[in-house]
Amino acid sequence: MSPYVTMILISSLGLGTTITFTSSSWLMAWMGLEINTLAITPLMVKQHHPRATEATTKYFLTQATASGLLLFATLNNAWMTGEWNTMELSNNLSAPMITMALALKMGVAPMHFWLPEVLQGLPLLTGLILSTWQKLAPFTLLYMTSHELNTTTMTILGLTSTIIGGLGGLNQTQLRKVLAYSSIAHLGWMVIIIQYSKTLALLNLLLYITMTSTAFLTLMTLSATKINTLSTKWATTPIATMTAMLALLALGGLPPLTGFMPKWLILQELTKQNLPALATLMALSALLSLFFYLRMCHTMTLTISPNTNNNMITWRKKPGQKALPLAMLSIMTLMALPTTPTMVAIMN
């Protein structure tokens, strides 16, 4: 693909998300989502591989369905209330339809069926964009309308996502599918807490993007797409392999890594809201995700080949262009937990 075309598509991605961020009208917000979808579709299919074509087709059909449902719900809301404002969602029929449409856009369970299959057919860089940037626009709409949405529906969606995200990753051998189910589980935490604390939901989104970016970039450095290939990477890129292992543990929420911070604060907030049963279920579902991350790290650590450093040096790769951003993201992923009191003070 031409660099000029790639630049135009990436600019369109930024434009679509910005339009959704700044719009107060449902029609403009829908337009921003459509620009996002149309911009990422050529980026997904640029390899001309059958799996990439299949993944792009699945993604496009799913996003088109979600967009159609969202447009119908907003038109119905405008017809019944006479309001196009995104903050006005008083129609009883439109609110659940918009919830389902945004859940389908993001990949929240039980509308998650497309996400693992689509990510599996994409290269890691495009998968990174799909797992992080493409979540921003629909999450913004969910953020703006959360006060109008049904609390029970949001709770069921969030709890289902955390459980399915944990169970779905248990029997996977492909790293991209593992990261897809990790994304589903993290979205469940955001959907749960957005009803009670919007600032916590934003913090969770920010840390999720940071940790997921670190995981994807380290896997790109390692050129790894399967779990069993991680065990052979110690000889070529030992530092990146160690970073990948710690980033995966951070995604699982293991202290003292950064991933523990949002789970800690969310469970604390749910307890303050007098929801101890929900907090307990969320904590137990987080153990499912942590288990398959620990299994991956077990595979990586117990199969280190007994080579001396002299044998390993000649095979090590030189640092690439991703070294500096990866280093900065890694520091945030691994060492931000001590800043939790500062984060809480800023949010309050």
Swiss-Prot record:
Endpoints of the signal sequence: none
Keywords: Electron transport, Membrane, Mitochondrion, Mitochondrion inner membrane, NAD, Respiratory chain, Translocase, Transmembrane, Transmembrane helix, Transport, Ubiquinone
Xref: Pfam families: NADH_dehy_S2_C (PF06444), Proton_antipo_M (PF00361)
Membrane topology category: Multi-pass membrane protein
Membrane listed as a keyword: yes
Enzyme nomenclature, EC number: 7.1.1.2
TM segment ranges: 1-21, 25-45, 60-80, 93-115, 149-169, 177-197, 200-220, 239-259, 274-294, 326-346
Reactions it catalyzes: a ubiquinone + NADH + 5 H(+)(in) = a ubiquinol + NAD(+) + 4 H(+)(out)
Broad enzyme group: translocase
Chloroplast keyword on record: no
Cellular component per GO, a single term: mitochondrial inner membrane
Molecular functions per Gene Ontology: NADH dehydrogenase (ubiquinone) activity
Alphabetical GO biological process terms: mitochondrial electron transport, NADH to ubiquinone
Annotated compartments: Mitochondrion inner membrane
Principal localisation: mitochondrion
Matching InterPro entries: Complex_I_Subunit_2 (IPR050175), NADH_DH_su2_C (IPR010933), NADH_UbQ_OxRdtase_chain2 (IPR003917), ND/Mrp_TM (IPR001750)
Function text: Core subunit of the mitochondrial membrane respiratory chain NADH dehydrogenase (Complex I) that is believed to belong to the minimal assembly required for catalysis. Complex I functions in the transfer of electrons from NADH to the respiratory chain. The immediate electron acceptor for the enzyme is believed to be ubiquinone.
Family per record: Belongs to the complex I subunit 2 family.
Protein's recorded name: NADH-ubiquinone oxidoreductase chain 2
